[in-house]
Amino acid sequence: MGSGYQLLQLPRERFRKTSFLVWVIILFQRAISMPLGIVTNSTLKATEIDQLVCRDKLSSTSQLKSVGLNLEGNGIATDVPSATKRWGFRSGVPPKVVSYEAGEWAENCYNLEIKKSDGSECLPLPPDGVRGFPRCRYVHKVQGTGPCPGDLAFHKNGAFFLYDRLASTVIYRGTTFAEGVVAFLILSEPKKHFWKATPAHEPVNTTDDSTSYYMTLTLSYEMSNFGGNESNTLFKVDNHTYVQLDRPHTPQFLVQLNETLRRNNRLSNSTGRLTWTLDPKIEPDVGEWAFWETKKTFPNNFMEKTCISKFYQPTPTTPQIRARRELSKEKLATTHPPTTPSWFQRIPLQWFQCSLQDGQRKCRPKV
């Protein structure tokens, strides 16, 4: 045992030399910020990428591209009963609308027409220029009633409702939307030698019908007590045949359910309403919840901070900032151009004028 122990034990002098070498490597790494391990040309740390993009490459806000990102990528439940629980009514909060340049193709979109018990509408009509989200695989069209305890329907998690290149904080009546957020991509300025070859331009067939390139399937629902704690959702197969939805499900499951009822002659054969209930043994999660389910584990949704904060400096937060909501119409007219609708909020980004001086690029804000 003793000799075996001596074999495993590092001699005192060698231990001192080894520990000294380790400390030298650690201090050396911290001093010059070189990652431990084999350093090659492909070794690039996240902080270096951040500095490369943010410090050296952003010379003009023309390099910023605003994009709409769907919440489906975070793995949220997309069935109607689950989705409607993320929306709620509030009063006294003005709606905000911002534009974005590009977006994703959505797997699930929604279209709501909800009335109060007295027959009045719960949701406002969309402002001029607001059109439905153009790329949806499934459109969940919901009609029904609810208490609607408030003037406008907002997202409880602070997300946007994405329409056609416009994102709003509220839901508009009869207008297809996807849930999402608006983010900025920073595009590096292209070098001149990138454009030596003539770029290939593919012919684009422009059309006013933005949904003509993509197969969209509309699924209809009927909902009662929309916006309440206990809402009831029915999947509409035809005008007289419905299915009670009592647990989360995928749109692919509803498509199969619709085909099964029709193929087996399970539709209502009278003018009365026939409502089916799901067998508890049936698995309603056929297909996919969303096309990027692996992002479910991402924490802190809507709280991501990027280097864009270095360039976009909002107005300092003061107690008077709330008073901006009560500004008179005359003051608002000086804030926005006359051609800008009152519901459209421009994103206040600073433009830069850049020039080369002594071989260095120098930028200053445009006046």
From Swiss-Prot:
Signal sequence, renumbered to the chain: 1-33
S-S bridge residues: C109-C136, C122-C148
Regions that span the bilayer: none
Keyword Cell cycle found: no
Site (Cleavage) location in chain: R325, E326
Keyword list, A-Z: Cleavage on pair of basic residues, Disulfide bond, Glycoprotein, Ion channel, Ion transport, Secreted, Signal, Transport, Viral ion channel
GO terms under biological process: monoatomic ion transmembrane transport
Record bears the keyword Disulfide bond: yes
Name this protein carries in UniProt: Pre-small/secreted glycoprotein
Designated gene of the protein: GP
